[in-house]
């Protein structure tokens, strides 16, 4: 699930991070970019509910390489199983099951690229090194559909949320930005300075990042007992709650701002209880 830019095979093993400056970063709801000057790459990210979209613009004349590294771990994680494989001239699929914050964390992905790979090498079963012909200066766009259920659902998420856009990164970004504007327009602020209003809406944006949607576009999701279930149409299954410190203010605020979200969260928590008889 981690796409890391690298100059070649040697960096796959060294895993040396690329230097960057925070002054070269840009961030807004649904968008992030960083200019990796040392590597000669502009990396941009946007998203839909189940798909991550990458755009990499390489400086002309350098080797255009992407590393898909499913071996990458946080300090407290352990990989039970995982793999990456090529399933088309411009497509990769893969999965990983780990133990870390919780046990048995599944993630499946289908990644489609805006042009075929010039070459692909696999240093390990969970890594892929891709090269592209970018001599024309045309960027590489990558769409990554994810699911915690299976590969088929990851593909379905990818198709339903991005097929109508093709590989038009800017169009997806604009649609995502419009969705965020609707989310943030639930409160209208008057008065104060521009900096204070920016601070307020940034905090409101942060309040809407979690919990995460755990169900796929077909309604399927993986329960806490590892079985797969399907929710009724129109409802979302959520995960990644932090109720120990959100019950004081965040939850009361959501009962005022987003009752649909609150209802879905309550149903999600009840489902966790029913699947484990434990919260």
How would you label these PLM feature ranges?
Residues 206, 210, 250-259:
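Well-ordered alpha-helical scaffold segments within catalytic/enzyme domains
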Residues 176, 245, 252, 261-265:
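Stable alpha-helical elements in mature extracytoplasmic
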Residues 14-45:
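Extended, loop-rich substrate-binding clefts of extracytoplasmic carbohydrate-active enzymes
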